[in-house]
């Protein structure tokens, strides 16, 4: 699906994301970083932070622990972009997820999108 965003850029995502407020912990080599998923799909997420996070590197893959109301889901996410000028947030593309966690994530997204 391609459509224009408010900024006028073409959307590249194939699967639309839904707006959420789910806690996320990112595991790094130096410890963990807590954030919040602002939007998510089964293919990726935008994660917001209370302050600027400098110790995450573009194109690097991190372990993400996503806490929905129903489940804790583990995915490996590649950091594909960083937006620090408006809101401390980063975009992740999911590169590895078990079938079980993918099913849990899909179920949580479907349930949350009906609210």
Regions found by a protein language model. Name each.
Residues 99-108:
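A short macromolecule-binding patch
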Residues 46-49, 85-95:
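Short, solvent-exposed secondary-structure boundary/capping segments
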Residues 39, 79-83, 96:
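A residue-level detector for short acidic-glycine micro-motifs
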Residues 65-85:
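Mid-chain, well-packed structural core segment of small domains
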């Amino acid at each position: 699906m391609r459509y224009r965003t408010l900024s006028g850029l073409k959307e590249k995502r194939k699967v639309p994301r839904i707006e959420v407020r789910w806690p996320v912990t990112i595991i790094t080599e130096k410890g963990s970083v807590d954030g919040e998923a602002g939007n998510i799909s089964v293919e990726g997420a935008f994660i917001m932070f209370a302050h600027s996070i400098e110790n995450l590197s573009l194109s690097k893959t991190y372990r993400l622990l996503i806490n929905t109301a129903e489940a804790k889901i583990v995915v490996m996410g590649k950091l594909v972009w960083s937006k620090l000028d408006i809101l401390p947030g980063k975009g992740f593309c999911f590169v590895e997820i078990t079938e079980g966690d993918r099913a849990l994530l899909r179920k949580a997204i479907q349930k949350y999108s009906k609210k």
